[in-house]
Amino acid sequence: MKEELVIFDTTLRDGEQSPGASMTKEEKVRIAKQLEKLRVNVIEAGFPAASQGDFESVQAVASAVKDSTVCGLARAVENDIVRAGEAIKLANSGRIHTFIATSPIHMEKKLKMSPDEVVERAVWAVKRARDFTDNVEFSPEDAGRSELDFLCRVIEAAIDAGATTINIPDTVGYNVPEQFGELFHQLLNRIPNADKAIFSAHCHNDLGLAVANSLAAVKSGARQVECTINGLGERAGNTALEEVVMAVRTRQDWFDVDTRIHTPEILAASRLVAGITGFAVQPNKAIVGTNAFSHESGIHQDGVLKHRETYEIMRAEDVGWSTNKMVLGKHSGRSAFRSRLKELGIEFETEQELSDAFISFKELADRKHEIYDEDIQALVTDNNTRRVENETFRLVALKVGTQTGDAPTATITLWIDGEEKTASSEGGGVVDATFKAIEKLVDSGATLELYSVSNVTNGTDSLGETTVRMEKAGRIVNGQGADTDIVTASAKAYINALNKLIDTGSKEHPQAHV
């Protein structure tokens, strides 16, 4: 019987620290529910002491998730630990993850504490966290650059104090696989009480080695890996959940562990996170990129047709790629739509949400002859995106015009706090004109940081997905929109971002570098 490798997902905490990836409370809950479908063991939902918004997000995830452990991050200080404990109180299974830096440069320059003081603080933090839960994780921040003897000392003390998981972070992505694997080997063999805790790896991808380092740690005895969907994270990102899971699953001849992850939900999780954060997945990304299971070479194509395993080491269906491309059309009824949603793993909390999605589907089917799985997923994402709490702005109508030699124009009507208002503008293109017309009505004062468009499927009638990123006074939000008309999709995305920008529930939080 293989040992279980615990999958600890930190998309909602460390992943959100990627500049521009900030999420609303509702978006975090949606992602958490998908992670629960994926059967992730632990969901790190946020940093409760960072802000009231983050506290409420962790609390909301703790209430919504039933089958995964919900974790809150806390520095080794009283307020952080208390806030984390309060935030996870409603969880069926809760964990507090507390940390303090242990590398010489961090202790001297950042903490201004002696090694003895750091050990004392670590012990206190673990004991204080256990006042709220028996499930306590301790991280020696920047462990990869810490002195081995001191690292052993502080970890032994933390386990004695009651830590049940010891996480070893390569905070700045400095380690290489052989070195990181050897570190785990040393820790597990030198620390007398190492068998009393699960050892975990948390790697950053600054040198492109996050997954390799994590797998090296697993080979040396780590039994938890901290990761994010799509490898999302600050700087170059974190360990990609989908890559670790499928590496372990595919190479059962090499690894002595397996995970409980329900892999057919991987692609849905990837698309949801990409859609909400606005961080598109590159086509050649392992497991979830659109080219991950494509074969251009004639020799490869011939081999795959004769026997799949000649050039494919895993099945596309095992991670959620559908072999059934064309699914529905304009004559499809509600029951067929509901059935296909179920096959795609898409669920709605209320019949009204299903009805709204079906109406959107019928509208799309009138404009698009063939409806694909990707269209349905984009349509549902678009509907969820527009379901914003305290919605202030809503698109009512949009008319654009362009002619060679003349400036493109746009006339837009918005519903603003219960009243319809209309404005027109010219621009360098129809999208530019549309955004300028919107600004005539709302005067947001925000700066457009990113505008990107991607097609959901092939063909000129494909749904287009648009992402905009806006910044105002240090706050960054993402907006998404989807439509067969790319200008309409752009307007939807811009309006979605504006609604988030004026939502006072959104927050700006300090970075936690674990």
From Swiss-Prot:
InterPro entries in the record: 2-IPM_HCS-like, 2-isopropylmalate_synth_dimer, AIPM/Hcit_synth_CS, Aldolase_TIM, LeuA/HCS_post-cat, LeuA_allosteric_dom_sf, LeuA_bact_synth, PYR_CT
Amino-acid positions noted as binding Mn(2+) in the UniProt annotation, renumbered to this chain: 14, 202, 204, 238
Keyword Transferase: yes
Cellular localization per UniProt: Cytoplasm
MF terms in GO: 2-isopropylmalate synthase activity; acetyl-CoA C-acetyltransferase activity; manganese ion binding
EC numbers, comma separated: 2.3.3.13
Pathway it works in: Amino-acid biosynthesis; L-leucine biosynthesis; L-leucine from 3-methyl-2-oxobutanoate: step 1/4
Region ranges (Regulatory domain): 394-514
Start and end residues of each Pyruvate carboxyltransferase domain: 5-267
Keywords: Amino-acid biosynthesis, Branched-chain amino acid biosynthesis, Cytoplasm, Leucine biosynthesis, Manganese, Metal-binding, Transferase
GO cellular component: cytosol
Pfam families per UniProt: HCS_D2 (PF22617), HMGL-like (PF00682), LeuA_dimer (PF08502)
Reactions this protein catalyses: 3-methyl-2-oxobutanoate + acetyl-CoA + H2O = (2S)-2-isopropylmalate + CoA + H(+)
GO biological process per UniProt: L-leucine biosynthetic process
Assembly and interaction partners: Homodimer.
Family: Belongs to the alpha-IPM synthase/homocitrate synthase family. LeuA type 1 subfamily.
Identification of the protein by name: 2-isopropylmalate synthase
